[in-house]
Amino acid sequence: LMNCAQLNLEPNTPQELAYLIPYKDECQFQIGYKGFLQLVYRSGIVSSFNADVVYRAEVENGMFEYRKGITPTITHKVDLLHPEAREGELIAAYAACTLKGGGEGMLRLVDKKDIERAQKTSASLAANKKYGKDSPWISSPEAMWMKTAIKRLAAWLPQTEMLAMAVDLDDKSERGESQLVLP
């Protein structure tokens, strides 16, 4: 609960900002993607933020394009006449933001291999599978993919104490490590 209070994220609410999750003999604090978004906005660093997932059908139908480079760009079109393109196999997620004060936007794209690596190192996913419990990686994969992209982008943003603490606490939760905070 100390972590919730320090980050000012109320757990287990309909807002889905953060969660208190039983893990072994302690309670783990886990930040949802909406909680990370709130922390990024609260930092005062960004003026706009966007995150989404990409489905295979979107790429195959020319609805998604990613260009790498010094100034990477994403074009993600939505076809309202074919909503089925937003279903099926997930292949990537991204997070993008515009920094306050102008300058170039920032963008991070994580592909399926990156996501699978994040899943493999997730102690909570392994524990949930072992004990037959539902994991957000299973029940809400889109949210977990976006959260991974947001965390990757947050690591590249100018760091505030709150943002750095949030990433550290969530990483510890994913690895199943103690999140004990010393005063």
Predicted regions and their residues:
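Binding-interface segments
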Residues: 2-162
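Single-stranded nucleic-acid nicking/binding segments centered on His-rich, glycine/basic loops
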Residues: 148, 158-183
